[in-house]
């Protein structure tokens, strides 16, 4: 390993996960300080070391093209709103049809069923953290968020140009009220929402899990299991079956699309790819004076 005798600085997307690629945060304050120091450090590497470093620390999809000083990201657009696509046309990487084909071919996979958002009484992290209603702060350039439900509904309002409802959503701290406000978005078009909703939830969960170490490690600990929102009520984001139902264990009998579970699996894949070598970094370099 060419880099073994060097203090390895983490790439920007690992050093300050709360700052997006094109955020002004890289041009002021601690973000600017880090990006300059990182650039100076990168210049000390030989061509061989730089190639090795790049292989060890691939860009996340949200920084696609950064190593080549290009913008290779693709977006879905509607008016002034846009969201990054992870897969062509923003389609899910995993689907119920894919899983049913896996099961039909005899490739059964472990299922990890979750539902509900309340923390455990002993303070231990449970599968509730996978819920859209789980309270955990995360940030984007646009705003801070207290849960994924708030992020999704604020994006929904922004998608349809309803600034008033978006502002109300961002000021609200009750998940139930946030969901109700999301239903009041003016100019709503179901076809447009269906095109954008998965990409919105995918990106929001990337922010949520990439910025929170404990959640990130718990998600990665689920391995390659199929994540399943066992909501007995939701046929879009869940399977419309309770975890206690025998049918919940059989994807052939699911009554819902499980879009949330599949989005979380896609986030898990990307986290694993991007963070697999972060233990090699010298984290003391992030806040070095």
Regions flagged by a language model, labelled:
Residues 2-289:
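Charged, low-complexity intrinsically disordered segments
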């Amino acid at each position: 390993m060419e880099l073994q005798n060097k203090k390895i600085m983490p790439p920007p997307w690992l050093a300050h996960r709360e700052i997006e690629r094109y955020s002004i945060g890289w041009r002021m304050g601690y973000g600017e300080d880090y990006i300059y120091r990182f650039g100076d450090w990168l210049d000390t590497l030989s061509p061989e070391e730089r190639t090795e470093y790049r292989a060890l620390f691939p860009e996340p999809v949200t920084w696609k093209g950064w190593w080549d000083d290009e913008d290779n990201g693709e977006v879905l657009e509607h008016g002034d709103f846009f969201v990054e696509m992870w897969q062509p046309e923003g389609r899910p990487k995993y689907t119920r049809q894919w899983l049913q084909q896996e099961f039909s071919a005899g490739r059964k996979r472990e299922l990890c069923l979750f539902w509900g958002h309340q923390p455990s009484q002993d303070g231990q992290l449970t599968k509730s953290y996978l819920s859209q209603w789980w309270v955990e702060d995360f940030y984007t350039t646009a705003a801070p968020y207290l849960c994924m439900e708030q992020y999704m509904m604020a994006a929904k309002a922004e998608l349809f140009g309803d600034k008033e409802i978006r502002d109300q959503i961002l000021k609200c701290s009750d998940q139930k009220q946030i969901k109700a406000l999301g239903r009041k978005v003016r100019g709503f078009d179901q076809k447009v929402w269906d095109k954008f909703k998965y990409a919105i939830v995918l990106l929001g969960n990337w922010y949520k899990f990439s910025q929170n170490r404990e959640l990130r490690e718990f998600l990665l600990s689920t391995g390659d299991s199929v994540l399943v929102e066992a909501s007995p009520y939701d046929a879009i984001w869940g399977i419309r079956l309770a975890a206690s139902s025998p049918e919940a264990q059989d994807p052939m009998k699911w009554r819902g699309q499980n879009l949330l579970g599949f989005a979380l699996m896609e986030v898990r894949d990307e986290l694993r790819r991007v963070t697999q070598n972060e233990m090699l970094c010298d984290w003391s370099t992030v806040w070095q004076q």
